[in-house]
């Protein structure tokens, strides 16, 4: 794994190199500014598998750098781990919204960094496997292809509040029990997602799910929120307040917005997504519900609602 680390503190970069070498990651390049990083990333002779970005840098911050990195075709889905010494978590949501996959605290803990980079390595291998399948199909048939599995999350980028599912889980984990108590979680389900999946190719399916995400994003515009596709046409939204939204009103708004796509879907021969809204969930102050359990509960909730709708 080739890693690019960006931090304005040369002493920290030396310490980071020591930690990474100790845990087996020796292919490291370091630079001290966002501008230097962008020059390297735009160089076709350079290729990095993972980026470690300090958030609090003068000039171009790590969050702004992450946003610019995501605009580069070669790095639109490269794993990005943010690094910070800041105690406040106010930066966390903007970082994930800009495209970060995870984050670690300074001073760097060797075990934490090993765990984070192991997850990054798994992500890289999965993406390489998919890219290999797509490349073989494209070569054999002369057509562009995106390999999508129905059960798995797909990366969507059409709406400003949409992030990867793993990134949403990582964001929720950063909140801790007390901050998570102040959030709400809500599930959405495209009940005919399997029919849509079978009626089009990977590109068409992703485009359709992106349209659904955009509609959900618009319906939640009154709340600060993040959304992720979770697989099987299901979405999870995190709202940064304990809210009691009128889900019936939300359902009506989504139905109306989806109807605007009816002519397009009829022309394409793809079923119009039928979106169901689940129940709003909160964690209890004294409960220790895990993030994964909370998200699973949100998905099960919307499945239950869809069964009787």
Go through each PLM region and give its residues.
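Conserved acidic segment of CheY-like receiver
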Residues: 1-20, 51
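Active-site residues of response regulator receiver
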Residues: 7, 54, 84
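Receiver (REC) domain active-site loop signature in two-component systems and cognate sites
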Residues: 57, 69
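CheY-like receiver
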Residues: 122-176
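Conserved long alpha-helical elements within nucleotide-processing catalytic cores of c-di-GMP signaling
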Residues: 154-173, 179-184, 191-217, 228-232, ...
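A short glycine-enriched loop-to-beta-strand structural element that forms part of the catalytic core
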Residues: 225-240, 263-297
């Amino acid at each position: 794994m080739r890693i690019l680390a960006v931090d304005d503190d040369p002493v920290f970069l030396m310490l980071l190199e020591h930690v990474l070498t100790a845990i087996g990651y020796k292919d490291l390049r370091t630079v001290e500014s966002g501008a230097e990083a962008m020059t390297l990333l735009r160089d076709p002779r350079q290729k990095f598998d993972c980026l470690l970005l300090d958030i609090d840098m003068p000039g171009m911050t790590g969050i702004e750098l992450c946003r610019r990195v995501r605009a580069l075709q070669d790095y639109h889905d490269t794993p990005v781990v943010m690094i910070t010494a800041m105690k406040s978590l106010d930066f966390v949501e903007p970082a994930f919204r800009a495209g970060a996959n995870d984050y670690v605290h300074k001073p760097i803990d060797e075990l934490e960094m090993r765990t984070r980079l192991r997850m990054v390595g798994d992500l890289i291998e999965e993406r390489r496997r998919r890219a290999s399948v797509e490349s073989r199909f494209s070569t054999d048939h002369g057509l562009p292809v995106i390999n999508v599995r129905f059960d798995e999350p797909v990366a969507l980028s059409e709406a400003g509040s949409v992030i990867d599912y793993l990134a949403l889980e990582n964001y929720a984990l950063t909140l801790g029990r007390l901050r998570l108590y102040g959030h709400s979680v809500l599930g959405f389900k495209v009940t005919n997602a399997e029919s849509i999946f079978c009626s089009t190719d990977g590109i068409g399916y992703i485009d359709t799910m992106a349209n659904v995400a955009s509609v959900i994003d618009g319906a939640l515009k009154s709340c600060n929120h993040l959304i992720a596709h979770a697989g099987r046409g299901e979405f999870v939204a995190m709202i940064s307040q304990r809210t009691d939204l009128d889900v019936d009103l939300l359902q009506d708004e989504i139905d109306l917005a989806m109807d605007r796509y009816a002519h397009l879907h009829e022309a394409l021969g793809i079923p119009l997504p039928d979106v169901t809204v689940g129940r709003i969930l909160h964690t209890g102050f004294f409960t220790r519900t895990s993030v994964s359990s909370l998200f699973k509960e949100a998905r099960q909730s919307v499945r239950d609602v869809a069964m009787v709708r």
